[in-house]
């Protein structure tokens, strides 16, 4: 049963040099296209001219003040990937710093989508459906609320990729290296990666050979840098874990921010306006339960194991995030002119895994319908089922492609950069004091600002 979680992808003939070159080019274009699409999803102020939340208040300001000090805690743990992006942003002209965060965050998401396309081959033989899976990450309906086009929340895309890395059995050393890098980046950026411990333990049990555990090694290596930072935070009484959310609030949070929002942000609010929040949640939840339950019962052991694993992982992930982040369970979402959902970043992985379960089920239906022989042999009802899945996902993709959120309420970064540079030009001390999180302000040398 556990072995069904780690299938080997069908092996294809080695590509010719021209085919390999074309494939590499196509993949680079796909990541670039995904990056552009993600940047386009930010409404009002362009993503490349807006520095969001900790990108400004923590990572950028601290990179300017203390260059290359990336192994330091914030909120009780290490966030290595956002720290590295912040360091990169500090090395470019000040006016372009916001663009570094935006493009890096979008490129990471696009790269994760491409990685998932490859890593899901053992479960999804259809290349078209694997492309749909990658698109599901790029076009995730809730993404504009917090995670699109910034550095601080790029980690949650990597966490989605880590789920697939834990299941993937790469044949090549390059594939193993990429899987290890994904695992290391995730674990070194958030201790939430602990949720994949049971999955990786199952991998060790099912696949005892050492060559199967590049991802496990990467995950463990991430803890080598993460644990000392967490312990340092406890020693200085700045740890993350202080109080916990009530269990009832946590379950309600999962139902209302994951299940209800799974098929679309605006669609969920429309359902709420008609049926009320709880009934709308029941409608969406029952629909998902029927579809995924049917797939688990009728589409074979591999689909059944995957559906259970994906749903359970998403549930545990959300519960853990909500338990240790009291703010998100006590703050109401907003659907007005400026949309906001507290902690929507924690919905990325569970919502994406629900989409993945639907797509894996669709692949099984397509395969049983004759897709292995050719499209000409696929029964019409099978094509209807796959088309229906596309329509369900497309509703959220279209209606939630771009909308105004609190993500851009910080204003234009270019104006801030000009103000900083003007202040430095007239500074008698050669220093500048700027707003910062945690400490309130930071005073740094004007020589740290690149023009």
Regions flagged by a language model, labelled:
Residues 158, 162-178:
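Membrane-interface transmembrane helices that cradle and orient dolichyl/undecaprenyl
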Residues 316-334:
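Membrane-interface helix-loop junctions at the exits of transmembrane helices
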Residues 1-64, 68-146, 173-177, 181, ...:
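Intrinsically disordered, polar/acidic, low-complexity terminal segments
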Residues 154-156, 333-363:
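Hydrophobic/aromatic-rich transmembrane helices and adjacent perimembrane loops
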Residues 165-172, 199-204, 288-295, 348-368:
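Transmembrane alpha-helices and membrane-interface helical segments
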Residues 181-202:
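Transmembrane helices and adjacent periplasmic/lumenal helix-loop junctions
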Residues 143-162:
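Multi-pass, polyprenyl lipid-linked donor-dependent membrane glycosyltransferases
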């Amino acid at each position: 049963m556990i072995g069904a979680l780690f299938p080997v992808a069908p092996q294809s003939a080695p590509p010719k040099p021209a085919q390999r070159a074309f494939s590499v080019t196509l993949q680079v274009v796909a990541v670039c296209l995904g990056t552009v699409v993600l940047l386009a999803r930010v409404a009002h102020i362009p993503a490349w001219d807006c520095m969001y939340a900790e990108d400004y208040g923590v990572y950028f300001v601290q990179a300017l003040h203390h260059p290359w000090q990336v192994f330091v805690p914030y909120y009780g743990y290490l966030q290595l990937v956002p720290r590295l992006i912040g360091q990169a942003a500090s090395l470019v002209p000040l006016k372009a710093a916001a663009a570094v965060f935006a493009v890096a965050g979008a490129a990471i998401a696009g790269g994760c989508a491409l990685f998932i396309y490859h890593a899901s081959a053992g479960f999804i033989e259809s290349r078209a459906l694997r492309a749909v899976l990658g698109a599901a990450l790029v076009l995730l309906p809730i993404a504009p609320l917090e995670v699109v086009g910034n550095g601080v929340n790029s980690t949650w895309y990597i966490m989605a990729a880590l789920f697939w890395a834990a299941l993937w059995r790469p044949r090549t050393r390059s594939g193993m290296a990429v899987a290890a890098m994904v695992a290391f980046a995730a674990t070194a950026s958030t201790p939430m990666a602990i949720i994949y411990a049971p999955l990786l333990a199952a991998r060790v049990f099912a696949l005892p050979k050492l060559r199967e555990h590049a991802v496990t090694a990467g995950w463990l290596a991430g803890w080598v840098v993460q644990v000392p930072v967490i312990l340092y935070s406890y020693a200085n009484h700045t740890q993350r874990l202080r109080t916990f959310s009530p269990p009832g609030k946590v379950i309600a949070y999962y139902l209302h921010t994951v299940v209800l929002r799974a098929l679309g942000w605006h669609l969920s609010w429309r359902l709420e306006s008609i049926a009320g929040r709880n009934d709308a949640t029941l409608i969406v939840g029952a629909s998902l339960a029927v579809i995924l339950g049917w797939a688990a019962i009728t589409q074979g052991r591999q689909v059944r194991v995957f559906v259970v694993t994906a749903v359970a992982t998403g549930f545990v992930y959300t519960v853990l995030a909500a338990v240790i982040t009291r703010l998100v369970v006590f703050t109401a979402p907003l659907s007005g002119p400026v949309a906001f959902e507290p902690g929507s970043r924690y919905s990325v992985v569970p919502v994406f895994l629900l989409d993945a379960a639907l797509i894996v089920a669709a692949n099984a239906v397509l395969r049983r319908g004759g897709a292995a022989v050719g499209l000409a042999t696929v029964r019409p009802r099978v094509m209807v089922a796959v088309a229906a899945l596309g329509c369900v996902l497309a509703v959220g993709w279209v209606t939630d492609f771009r909308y105004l959120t609190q993500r851009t309420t910080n204003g234009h970064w270019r104006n801030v950069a000009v103000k900083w540079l003007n202040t430095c030009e007239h500074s008698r001390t050669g220093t500048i004091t700027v707003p910062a999180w945690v400490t309130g302000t930071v005073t740094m040398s004007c020589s740290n600002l690149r023009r």
